[in-house]
UniProtKB/Swiss-Prot annotation:
Catalytic residues (UniProt): H127, D155, S258
Record-listed E.C. numbers: 3.4.21.-
Name recorded for this polypeptide: Serine protease pic autotransporter
Function as written in the Swiss-Prot or TrEMBL entry: Involved in intestinal colonization, displays in vitro mucinolytic activity, serum resistance, and hemagglutination. Important to penetrate the intestinal mucus layer.
Length: 1372
């Protein structure tokens, strides 16, 4: 470029100036004359000549990659990024780009010489006369200049393009134009950045230059200082590359940068604006650049000149009829009597086409002729429908639909032409049949709703391209466009499947901006059957073979002339030897001869490229989102599928059938330097990617979650291999270029924790699946006939785990923390440096509370050095531990967590197993190599154990299970404040053997006997053996509650024989009153159920007296709560239904009836908790004498279904049935004080029978039993009631209140307790209480009544705290 001017050296300026090729002699003479002009006049004189600015001289102490990334918005320089640090090559901070958010340079053309300022216009300098086209973004679309629009007097032009640019957003243009000193105002313009592609140099602090590349090789960018001059021209000195006033990244324009932009950040408008284009510089060794400020008036006028008169549709006058004469390039839009002339392409002149703007609500246009509008576009300010007569088409620069508009487009295009669409509004494609034209959209919404022709053919477009990140294309149905012809260009856009099922055989996505989504309520089915490959192969370049050897690209084609014949070779290695002697051309490891026919050689290379592509992995850089399921069948040729974009399918399933699937992060793209790849496997900077779906379904697949990827999904695996935290990674060596994907496979291990992959969800493994966890994991695992291997130090099982026929191994620094219980029918293995932590479940929104959890396994194998097993914070673990290597076992914690009350049955069960300790283990520890520590913990020996060392603090070690005795062998024992519980059958016992050293104090030695010792029996059984010299005070006899007794062993210490032994002599046993009281309270629950029924026995007969003896069907519901000593409380709901009949006799009314009852009660105390459900029935009779006397009789049977859990003596949960009988009689006399007021003395006697019950179980190895026999309560009651009746014309209410004394005449049942120390009998007691009641009965209708009563008792051992009785009666 820059062909209009040549460069000449001017000694006055110390640099080059641009002169016309037609004026060389004049300029030479002028330069000579400049030597006589004062230095102060130099700037003005230099500006008289159009010096060519020729481009990028930058600091040598900053990595050149920084300047490249800056220019292309890559690396750190993402648009909008703030406070970007700039470091030199030694890692020292040079400065920060903190005065403005990072600018978006996408509006700068790919060659850096022009900038897009409107969808169809660019700006540059007019002396750039050589370029005829521009491209943007990744340069895949080329736009032709149809009019250069050169400024008449200054070095500036604003060319018009043939099409609307869809890839990028135009740059905003300064609103201040050439206003004097405007850009020196730093309060408004806070930063100045430039980008260009001129000749590249680096400069050191001594001013030495090193050339990097020639002009237009690539773009660089950087900072410039505040302008020294600001008017129609901006002048500054970015060539002073180490001067801080130019910012941390100064970039001095040099040869090739003419027309490149200068951007300024407008703080007032909060956006970057282009203010000028680069015109000149002061020479390679100079410092000054000159920019021409954008002449905004001229620019606006240029764009305005390309518009025809606006068209205003008037509703009610019919459609706009559009006729067009291709020969003249003119047409007419007419509506009624009004006409608008338009201009289209004239011959080959695209610029003859003018833009049309349409307004008017709900407009309609009909094309009568095909319209070729050239570079003219259509802009719709309002919603329109555009249709065409049969076969008529439209072509032009494109369509703009303004925000809020919906344009229905019923016009087909032309093959080979693309409809370019911009604007935030909607364009609905609604033509008929097959549209051979394509679509390129860069903004707004395009709805594809093409209609079928008479043959049923539909095609909205032959191809669709989305770019710039702004557009959305919505599929009306699955036939609108061949999915394989949909592509996403620079920054992409959204393809909305709109509830349709769509199949892709290839994905053409340039970058992360490519989005496939579904926003419809109907779920879409997306099939990625990625078997197709790109068959477009560029013509390979042919390199020359150096006779002296050299380097090249393996697989590329080279040629050499030998004996006057051109021979073609394919290079096999990265370098090759000389071809003169030791001819390397004959070495098959270096070269492959492919003949002397150029065309055949070229085709051979192409065929091999295609063959290679058939095996290449598929990399999708884009995004899958919305309401859809995605299926990926096996890809032919074993090709792998890699996602380095993202997936967000919260309610969707992604399924992979066979083959390899990889989710990974994305390497940060950097600008290429001299052909370098934009990304590499060994780079340090990667972008995180998120993958979210409801379910990831894998069948016969190999799945990898690699670096910088986060997966949030459940996984269902069938015969598949899952690697979480894989080091496997792929990069696309064409990433960010928009070219065909060139994958490179390798390994990439993250350097920081934040770059590691992470998984959250629940995994189900089936049918020989394998799971390798090498990264952060949170969730659950269920494995069936599968294998799990953990090497990650950060694996958290938050859901209950199940392993059936499956292995679980933690090794190589892996750490598994389980928080919610686990089941395994096999052994869990910890290898070298592997750690397993079993914990309770953290309680949400608390700092240190944990709910207990149970871990049931067949065992734990500690097979590698430094393996560790930790049982802590409310965990109960069972399963033998075998330590075959030096390892550690920790039970409990010296800083124990607070155990929360159980909210689930599983948690309650786990809590009961802890027995008040912070953690518990049940099993043996073998191997002799484990170091075991216990803090506030319980270890129940499940078998003989051998360990290296044992440290015990405030803990308990006991032996339980079958009647086999256990031996604990430990080399070194350190125990303090702990409890050791051993068993004996009076002949043998559990034993503790310490072989090397025993230390500690305040330890209790307790003995649980399995047989009842004879009075005064001497035992002489060794319990603990320790090395000689061990303190005799280390163990003392402890007292332990076992069953219902407090048992204290009698011991003596024997120091003879070279050991210290603690020997059991016998026992002292006495009843434990607390345990006995709990047992008695449990057994007396039946008495309290009996009293509940007694208090509700005669309610119906009392109602008869209040209702003047009306008989009939009735129903009653009662609810109450009671309490007693020992923390006892109960509550019940009691329902009665019945029917009675009245018999009128001489002087007496006799009522007989039948009743059925149901009671649901629950009870809780310090000793037990549970529920009783009772069902019963009975007969009753009531005699009401005319004198006021009455007699009530009732008989009743009740069956009780009981379910209770005792928390004493290891009772556990018991389910049992009982029954009871009742026979009651009550008599009294109702004396009327007035006609409606009465007093009623009463006396009642209830006799009953309550069935007994017997329980037998074991507390440890001690046999226990509890029994109470059938007993017959006799309960009396005397009292008085006072009542009054209130009545009206159609109603009456009887209110009453009463008090009575209820008392037991017989003791309740005796409880018999038995354990190894003997039998204990607890005699039944009597109870009594004062009852209070208040109630009312109301007549609702003649034959309906409603009653309500409240009761309470006091002064008893068992009292009714409150009771409510509601009844309803229907008389007939």
């Amino acid at each position: 470029m820059n062909k209009v001017y040549s460069l000449k050296y001017c000694p006055v300026t110390g640099g080059l100036i641009a002169v016309s090729e037609l004026a060389r002699r004049v300029i030479k003479k002028t330069c000579r004359r400049l030597t006589h002009i004062l230095l102060a006049g130099i700037p003005a004189i230099c500006l008289c000549y159009s010096q060519i600015s020729q481009a990028g001289i930058v600091r040598s102490d900053i990595a050149y990659q920084i300047y490249r990334d800056f220019a292309e918005n890559k690396g750190l320089f993402v648009p909008g990024a703030n406070d970007i640090p700039v470091y030199d090559k030694d890692g020292k901070l040079v400065g920060r780009l903190g005065k403005a958010p990072m600018a978006d340079f996408s509006s700068v053309s790919s060659n850096g010489v022009a900038t897009l300022v409107s969808p169809q216009y660019i700006v540059s300098v007019k002396h750039n006369g050589g370029y005829r086209s521009v491209s943007f973004g990744n340069g895949k679309n080329t736009y032709s200049l149809v009019d250069r629009n050169n400024h008449p007097s200054i070095d500036f032009h604003a060319p018009r393009l043939n099409k609307l640019v869809t890839e990028v957003i135009p740059s905003a243009v300064t609103s201040e134009g050439t206003k004097a000193n405007a850009y020196k105002y730093t309060e408004r313009y806070t930063a100045f950045y430039r980008v260009g592609s001129g000749t590249q140099y680096t400069k050191d602090k001594d001013g030495n230059l090193v050339k990097v590349a020639g002009g237009y090789a690539f773009k660089t960018g950087g900072t410039t200082g505040v302008p020294l001059i600001s008017d129609a021209t901006i002048v500054s000195n970015p060539g002073q590359t180490y001067n801080p006033v130019n910012g941390p990244l100064p970039d001095y324009g040099a040869p090739g940068d003419s027309g490149s932009p200068l951007f300024a950040y407008d703080k007032q408008q909060k956006k970057w604006v282009i203010v000028a284009v680069l015109r000149a510089y002061a020479g390679i060794n100079g410092a000054t650049n000159w920019w021409n400020v954008i002449p905004t008036d001229y620019l606006n006028q240029v764009m305005q000149d390309d518009f025809d008169a606006p068209v205003d549709f008037v509703s009610g006058l019919g459609p706009l009829n559009w006729t067009y004469d291709k020969t003249s390039g003119t047409g007419t839009l007419s509506q009624g009597s009004k006409n608008w002339t338009m201009h289209g392409q004239k011959d080959n002149d695209l610029n003859a086409g003018k833009n049309l703007v349409f307004s008017g609500q709900n407009g309609a246009i009909i094309l009568k002729d095909s319209v070729t509008q050239g570079a003219g576009y259509l802009e719709f300010k309002d919603s329109y429908t555009v249709s065409a007569e049969s076969g008529k088409t439209w072509t032009g620069a494109g369509i703009i639909t303004d925000k809020g508009t919906n344009v229905t487009w019923k016009v087909n295009g032309v093959a080979g032409d693309n409809l370019h669409k911009l604007g935030e509004g909607t364009l609905t494609i609604n033509g008929t049949g097959v549209n051979p034209g394509g679509l390129k959209t860069g903004d707004g919404i395009v709805v594809l709703n093409q209609q079928a022709d008479t043959a049923g053919n539909i095609q909205a477009f032959s191809s669709v391209n989305l770019a710039s990140g702004r557009p959305t294309v919505v599929l009306g149905d699955a036939r609108q466009v061949n999915p394989d012809n949909i592509s996403w260009g620079y920054r992409g856009g959204k393809l909305d499947l709109n509830g349709n099922a769509v199949t892709f055989t290839r994905l053409q996505a340039a970058d992360y901006g490519a989005v496939i989504t579904n926003n419809a309520q109907q779920k879409s089915q997306l099939l990625l059957d990625l078997k197709a490959q790109d068959t477009n192969v560029s013509e390979p370049t042919i390199g020359n073979i150096s006779p002296f050897g050299g380097t090249g690209t393996p697989g590329n084609l080279y040629s050499m002339i030998l004996n006057s014949q051109t021979r073609f070779y394919i290079l096999k290695s990265a370098s090759y030897g000389n071809t003169l002697w030791g001819n390397s051309l004959n070495d098959p490891a270096q070269w492959e001869f492919v003949g002397m026919n150029k065309n055949k050689a070229v085709q051979t290379v192409k065929d091999r490229i295609l063959a290679g592509r058939a095996k290449q992995p598929v990399i999708f850089h884009g995004q899958l989102t919305g309401n859809m399921d995605v299926a990926i069948p096996q890809v032919p040729g074993g090709r792998k599928v890699i996602f380095d974009g993202s997936v967000n399918l919260p309610e969707g399933t992604l399924s992979q059938d066979s083959g390899t699937l990889i989710f990974q992060g994305h390497p940060v793209i950097h600008a290429s330097i001299s052909g370098s790849a934009p990304v590499s496997l060994n780079q340090k900077d990667w972008e995180n990617r998120q993958f979210t779906m409801k379910t990831l379904s894998l069948k016969d697949a190999d799945f990898h979650l690699s670096r910088n990827a986060s997966l949030n999904s459940d996984i269902k695996s069938d015969n598949s291999h899952i690697t979480l935290g894989s080091d496997r990674a792929f990069v696309d060596k064409n990433d960010g270029t928009g070219n065909y994907v060139i994958p490179e496979e390798g390994t990439s291990v993250p350097d920081t924790v934040n770059d590691r992959s992470q998984y959250e969800g629940n995994i189900t493994l089936n049918h020989n699946s394998a799971l390798d966890i090498g990264s952060r994991f949170t969730g659950g695992i269920d494995a069936y006939d599968s294998a799990v291997s953990i090497t990650s130090p950060d694996v958290l099982l938050t859901a209950p785990g199940a392993f059936a026929g499956s292995s679980l191994t933690v090794h190589d620094g892996g750490h598994l923390t389980a928080l919610n219980g686990l089941f395994s029918d096999g052994h869990i293995q910890a290898g070298k440096n592997g750690k397993i932590t079993l914990s309770g479940t953290p309680v949400k929104d608390t700092a240190n509370q944990y709910a207990p959890a149970v871990y049931l396994t067949d065992g734990y194998d500690l097979t590698g050095d430094n393996a560790a097993l930790e049982i802590t914070r409310g965990a109960h673990a069972s399963g033998d531990i075998h330590a075959s290597a030096a390892s550690t076992v920790t039970i409990g914690s010296d800083t124990p967590a607070e155990l929360a009350s159980a909210e689930t049955a599983a948690s309650a069960f786990a809590g009961s197993l802890l027995e008040g300790y912070n953690a518990a283990f049940n099993g043996a520890i073998t191997g002799g190599r484990a170091d075991v520590s216990m803090h506030n913990a319980l270890w129940t020996l499940g078998g003989d154990s051998a360990i290296h060392s044992l440290t015990v603090r405030n803990s308990r070690i006991s032996s339980e299970g079958d009647r086999t005795f256990r031996t604990l062998t430990v080399n070194k024992l350190d125990a303090t404040g702990s409890d050791f519980v051993l068993r004996t059958d009076l002949k043998n016992a559990d034993k503790i053997n310490v072989t090397e050293k025993a230390t500690g104090s305040d330890n209790s030695l307790n003995v649980s006997f399995m047989n009842n010792p004879a009075q005064g029996q001497a035992l002489n059984i060794p319990l603990v053996t320790a090395p000689a010299g061990t303190s005799a005070e280390m163990f003392k006899a402890g007292t332990r509650v076992t069953g219902f007794s407090r048992v204290t062993p009698t011991l003596h210490v024997d120091t003879s024989g070279g050991n210290t032994k603690w020997i059991l002599d016998g026992f002292k046993a006495e009843a434990d009153k607390a345990a006995a009281a709990k047992a008695d309270s449990f057994m007396n629950a039946g008495y309290k159920n009996f009293m509940t029924e007694v208090n509700n026995l005669n309610k119906r007969m009392g109602d008869l007296r209040d209702t003047n003896g009306d008989a009939g069907a009735w129903a009653r519901i009662m609810s109450g709560a009671g309490s007693a000593d020992g923390g006892y409380s109960d509550n019940y709901t009691h329902v009665q239904v019945g029917f009675d009949k009245k018999h009128e006799l001489d002087g007496v009314d006799l009522f007989t009836g039948v009743t059925m009852t149901y009671t649901d009660s629950s009870a809780d105390s310090h000793a037990f908790s549970g529920k009783t459900k009772s069902v019963g029935g009975g007969l009753y009779a009531s005699a009401l004498f005319e004198s006021g006397a009455y007699i009530d009789l009732i008989g009743k049977y009740i069956h009780h279904d009981n379910d209770y859990t005792g928390n004493f003596a290891s009772l556990g949960t018991k389910h049992y049935n009982t029954h009871s009988w009742y026979a009651g009689a009550e008599t009294g006399y109702r004396y009327h004080l007035t006609e409606d007021t009465f007093i009623e003395p009463q006396a009642e006697l209830v006799y009953g029978a309550v069935s007994g019950k017997t329980f037998r179980w074991k507390d440890g190895d001690m046999d226990l039993s509890m029994k109470n026999r059938d007993f017959s309560p006799l309960v009396g009651r005397t009292g008085v009631e006072l009542g009054k009746t209130f009545s009206g014309k159609d109603w009456s209410v009887t209110a009453r209140a009463g008090t009575s004394w209820q008392f037991d005449l017989l003791n309740n049942g005796e409880t018999v307790l038995r354990d190894a120390s003997g039998e204990k009998r607890i005699k039944g007691e009597k109870d009594s209480r004062m009852l209070f009641n208040v109630g009312m009965n109301a007549q609702i209708k003649d034959n309906m009544r409603f009653g309500l009563e409240f009761e309470k008792s006091a002064f008893g051992k068992y009292n009714v705290d409150n009771a409510v009785n509601a009844n309803f009666r229907y008389m007939f």
